């Protein structure tokens, strides 16, 4: 039996990834409806992919016969996620699931009442290059340093390679109210005294850098302390980049750097794991491409020979 799924949010990530992939997995999923506050976007996506229903209200989607919903609309996603859980729908939430710990606790509470499955979109845990690197890291008992570097261009440079459509039919009032809710959530998370650079750096952590952080946690576990944090500011006071150093109970350190470099097309995201006898380097492709990442392993074998193995992970069909 196929899972009947509905999608909330018809922007770039839905058009580039979610709807095409779910369509390819037609033996397992049936997209029965899409929803967006932009009626034009919802109608376009429904017509292009021959999806039978489109909505501008998530309540209407939840009142249909969907088994599950995929939430990839503009943050925050808390309200619609909780409505979906209360409606008894299984929920997949694009990162971040929310912006405050209190909202996570609220989702967990509602989930425990309903018994549905709620999952967040931490897809890079299943990136073949990452899976390979993690299995290699599990053989190391002398990890001393992990280095994450994420030099992020404007997503538009990569999204423009795909057939996407944008529409201008969302009211200014709705845009402003959504922005206020998001800003209020950031204030709840950081406090009233947080400056603009901290607020924008926090959204970087909740945005593109979240992939690096959950990947790091999946390999190293929970750090024992934060040793240092620095935020670079733009002239307008927003965050240009962030760097921090974490320490783990083993004594290992992790250095994490994220920079917004909007104008150059090149996407540079790496995970490096250093030990005395083995080094692993994962190079990620942009999040809008299909598996094109690589994992380089340098090590000394049992005979004392130095080896270098570069693994390229090409696109493999999702079925």
Short names for language-model regions:
Residues 93-94, 118-120, 282:
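Hydrophobic residues in well-ordered beta-strands that form the structural core
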Residues 196-288, 317-319:
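Contiguous beta-strand/loop segments that form the cofactor/metal-binding neighborhood of enzyme cores
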């Amino acid at each position: 039996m196929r899972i009947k799924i509905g999608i909330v949010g018809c922007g770039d990530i839905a058009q580039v990834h979610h709807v095409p992939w779910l369509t390819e997995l037609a033996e397992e999923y049936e997209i029965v409806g899409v929803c967006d506050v932009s009626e034009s976007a919802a109608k376009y996506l429904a017509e292009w992919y021959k999806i039978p229903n489109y909505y501008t209200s998530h309540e209407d989607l939840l009142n249909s016969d969907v088994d599950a919903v995929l939430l990839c609309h503009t943050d925050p996603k808390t309200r619609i996620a909780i409505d979906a859980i209360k409606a008894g729908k299984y929920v997949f939430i694009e990162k971040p699931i929310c912006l405050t710990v209190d909202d996570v606790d609220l989702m967990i509470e509602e989930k425990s009442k309903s018994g549905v499955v709620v999952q967040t979109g931490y897809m890079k845990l299943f990136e073949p290059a990452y899976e390979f690197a993690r299995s290699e890291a599990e053989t190391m008992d002398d990890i001393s340093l992990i280095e994450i570097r994420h030099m992020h261009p404007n997503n538009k440079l990569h999204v423009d390679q795909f057939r996407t459509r944008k529409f201008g039919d969302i009211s200014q009032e709705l845009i402003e109210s959504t922005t206020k809710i998001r800003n209020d959530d950031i204030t709840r998370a950081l406090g009233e005294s947080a400056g603009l650079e901290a607020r924008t750096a926090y959204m970087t952590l909740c945005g593109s850098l979240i992939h690096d952080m959950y990947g790091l946690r999946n390999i190293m576990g929970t750090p024992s302390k934060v040793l240092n944090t620095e935020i670079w500011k733009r002239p307008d006071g927003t965050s240009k980049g962030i760097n921090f150093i974490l320490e783990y109970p083993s004594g290992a350190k992790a250095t994490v750097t994220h920079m917004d470099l909007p104008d150059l097309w090149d996407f540079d995201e790496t995970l490096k794991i250093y030990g005395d006898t083995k080094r692993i380097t994962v190079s990620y492709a942009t999040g809008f491409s299909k598996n094109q990442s690589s994992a380089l392993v340098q090590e000394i074998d049992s005979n004392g020979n130095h080896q270098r193995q570069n693994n390229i992970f090409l696109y493999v069909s999702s079925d």
